[in-house]
Amino acid sequence: MKKTKERETPEVPDELFAKCPACKHMIYQKDLGLEKICPKCFYNFRISAKERLAITVDGDSFQEMFTGIKSKDPLNFPAYQEKLAATQSKTGLDEAVVTGTAEFTGQKAALAIMDSNFIMASMGTVVGEKITRLFEYAREERLPVVIFTASGGARMQEGIMSLMQMAKISAAVKRHSNAGLFYLTVLTDPTTGGVTASFAMEGDIILAEPQTLIGFAGRRVIETTVRETLPEGFQKAEFLLEHGFVDAIVKRTELKKTIAKLLAFHGGSK
């Protein structure tokens, strides 16, 4: 008898499809578009700072600032420097936030974009320093500030130094505000921990993308502490909008236009 030739299973490249975390459908990458929105349920996929820049600011208007700042690893935390180096190599980023200036339909602003691909955009000394310097620069140059937040919280490898960044950035936000300048925050998934407890919620206007997770501690931690069952979806942008913690939920495709209008209305710089 002749042996039947085994049928070879074709290999499908990993990057060809993406599974939607919300509806669980397998989506052809090209169908997600530049905005990375699920065509089935309209879930907003998490995107990198580079992808965010491509869909949000005018052409080549972004001018990066405050690069090359490095953590001194204050606790000599085991394998921390190795983790930083590996993440930098993988993402092409120096740190969890990209800072600079950019234009939104001709409206110039100081801009920061946090990237959850970099150690979950945890806030350490470098993130704190870059954002603080951005606010100080914006105050000197009379520029509004726009920040896209995303974070898992404070960076545990830097201990109390990471927590100190909450007060440090908040003080810079206050000085910028005292100068009569506009500050806009856009909360993206997830915005949690010390970032939520400080500058993410200090904007003059607070926008959020649909279904963004926003909170300080996790649901289980809160329920264990208060010994109560919390409402379904209480840490989602829609719940926070209903209770007055967020000013508006804006579709990713509408963000650039919305930001430009707000900057123009609040005396943005041209």
From Swiss-Prot:
Zinc fingers, C4-type class: 20-41
Positions that bind Zn(2+): C20, C23, C38, C41
Keyword terms, alphabetized: ATP-binding, Cytoplasm, Fatty acid biosynthesis, Fatty acid metabolism, Lipid biosynthesis, Lipid metabolism, Metal-binding, Nucleotide-binding, Transferase, Zinc, Zinc-finger
Record field: catalytic activity: N(6)-carboxybiotinyl-L-lysyl-[protein] + acetyl-CoA = N(6)-biotinyl-L-lysyl-[protein] + malonyl-CoA
Residues of the CoA carboxyltransferase N-terminal domain: 16-270
CC per GO annotation: acetyl-CoA carboxylase complex
One annotated GO biological process: malonyl-CoA biosynthetic process
Group of enzyme by EC: transferase
Protein location: Cytoplasm
Cofactor comment text: Binds 1 zinc ion per subunit.
Statement: the UniProt record of this protein carries the keyword Phosphoprotein: no
SUPFAM superfamilies: ClpP/crotonase
Pathway as given in its UniProt record: Lipid metabolism; malonyl-CoA biosynthesis; malonyl-CoA from acetyl-CoA: step 1/1
Subunit (UniProt): Acetyl-CoA carboxylase is a heterohexamer composed of biotin carboxyl carrier protein (AccB), biotin carboxylase (AccC) and two subunits each of ACCase subunit alpha (AccA) and ACCase subunit beta (AccD).
Record family assignment: Belongs to the AccD/PCCB family.
Name of the protein described by the UniProt record: Acetyl-coenzyme A carboxylase carboxyl transferase subunit beta
Native organism: Streptococcus mutans serotype c (strain NN2025)
Gene: accD
